[in-house]
Curated annotation (Swiss-Prot):
It comes from Streptococcus sanguinis (strain SK36). It is found in: Cytoplasm. It catalyses: ATP + H2O = ADP + phosphate + H(+). It comes from the Bacteria. SUPFAM superfamilies: P-loop containing nucleoside triphosphate hydrolases (SSF52540), Winged helix' DNA-binding domain (SSF46785). This is Holliday junction branch migration complex subunit RuvB. Belongs to the RuvB family. The gene is ruvB. One of its GO terms (molecular function) is ATP binding.
Amino acid sequence: MSRILDNELMGDEELVERTLRPQYLQEYIGQDKVKDQLKIFIEAAKLRDEALDHTLLFGPPGLGKTTMAFVIANELGVNLKQTSGPVIEKSGDLVAILNDLEPGDVLFIDEIHRLPMAVEEVLYSAMEDFYIDIMIGSGETSRSVHLDLPPFTLIGATTRAGMLSNPLRARFGITGHMEYYEAGDLTEIVERTAEIFEMAITHEAAKELALRSRGTPRIANRLLKRVRDYAQIMGNGLIDDKITDQALSMLDVDQEGLDYVDQKILKTMIEVYGGGPVGLGTLSVNIAEERETVEDMYEPYLIQKGFVMRTRTGRVATRKAYEHLGYEYMKE
């Protein structure tokens, strides 16, 4: 069974997200710093009749990087071609995509950190000088062919910016750090989703959902759907704060947005390791999760909310973690 607070896409959520996707910056809720910067850069590029500089969007899953890429293309009034790092297996695949671009087009590569190195190297000249050199034939009959490309904008999205090579990272003129959403912005997103799908919800219920959604719109919309189900079966269809609390309690999502896995991590740190420090590998083995899963999916939110600290000697549970789980804090 999938974890309700997983910030990766589940089931039909890609279709749902396309339905909810804003078209322009003015409609995009949250990420104000990124939006304000992009608005200036986009207007300047349009004023000069140039392609927008290559743009890197990075941050945890579910924060709207793909949506932002589509919004940028709409603001520029150009087409967007979408692909992802794992799909482009060899340089010939990328050459075919690049050769199909029209002047000013946006090429969006999701999970760009997963591009094979041979493919990435083809991007260097394409991004910097809008050309590629490709080899045709093999052996003694092989020859290099120079192929000019129209000016285009590459938008790369990644959850692991640190995994990008320095040469690739240096070729992005614009970077946007997508951060966890404030509760007010998430409340607005929940109310917008409810309106689009004709769900009856009170403002207080929307606020409660926002507070428990880990700062992530994808999770907020997923929880909203599950609370709607609960309201229709256990209530009269209205999503109010009481129904919301009952539904989220049933789903093991507490007032801080922690689920059973988060609580298991904190309890293990406190009960088994005295609050830490404990190494990430050791902790992962103890809770039977992959190290990368703990590091990428669980730990960022626990750190952001102040339940866990990273130290040079390992992870440490904070006073807030002790108090939240009802333990007496005895640390010096």
